[in-house]
A protein has these predicted regions:
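Short, charged juxtamembrane terminal tails flanking transmembrane helices
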Residues: 201-203
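A short, hydrophobic C-terminal helix/tail in secreted or cell-surface proteins
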Residues: 179-198
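Sequence/structural signature of beta-propeller domains
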Residues: 1-176
Length: 203
């Protein structure tokens, strides 16, 4: 199915609408969050409802990138066929499930409702600057059912973005010291993902 992404020019008030195809492998998934990488590329968090809190095992928790530069304005379009026909292609940025599996977290321990993501402060480790991406679950404030709130933190470089054909990252926050000691390193090479560090906290 198609979702609409609405852009608003704060200065002029002009609005535009673009189509986003939330299907993965022919099946539609929930689009839980969207982040701006820059002024034309956006990251969308897509997920199933499986995992911790659902009594099942996580299957799909992924972040995709979509580029709206040159995309068709669908403000005057309606109907799934028309919207999907105008949807720009998307690129897999991070397979969260695969990354967490590589860090030793089983599918059944991955929160079902991974719904939030935000860019954090840049960090400097070994003289190299990394950008950070925070991914979090929504436990619906139901103790003992969905589990504690968890925050998974991934780091990436400008070179990682370039390798995926993505544009420059426009960060809105300042740099910070190296990651805290309890950070959990992820081995993500060859998995079509960008992170290298994950951290989990209780809310």
């Amino acid at each position: 199915t198609a979702n609409r992404i609405v852009s608003i020019d704060i200065a002029s008030g002009d609005t535009h609408q673009y189509s986003f195809n939330n299907a993965i492998g022919g099946k539609a998934y929930n689009s839980s969050e969207i982040l701006a990488l820059n002024d034309h590329q956006f990251w969308v968090l897509e997920r199933d409802g499986k995992g911790l809190g659902d009594g099942s095992s996580a299957k799909v928790k992924q972040i995709w990138s979509v580029d709206l530069a040159g995309a068709t304005d669908v403000s005057d379009l309606s109907g799934q066929a028309s919207l999907l026909g105008a949807a720009p292609s998307k690129t897999l940025v991070l397979d969260i499930k695969v990354a967490l599996n590589a860090a030793g977290i089983a599918d059944a321990a991955i929160p079902a409702k991974i719904e939030g993501m935000s860019f954090g402060e840049d960090i400097v480790d070994g003289g190299q600057t990394f950008h950070t991406l925070y991914v979090a679950n929504d436990n619906d404030f139901v103790p003992g059912v969905a589990g504690d709130n968890k925050f998974f933190v991934f780091r990436f470089t400008d070179a990682d973005l370039a390798a995926k054909g993505l544009g420059a990252f426009h960060n809105q926050v300042s740099s910070a010291p190296v990651p805290e000691p309890e950070s959990l390193a992820l081995s993500l090479a060859g998995l079509a993902v960008i992170g290298a560090v994950a951290r989990r906290r209780k809310a």
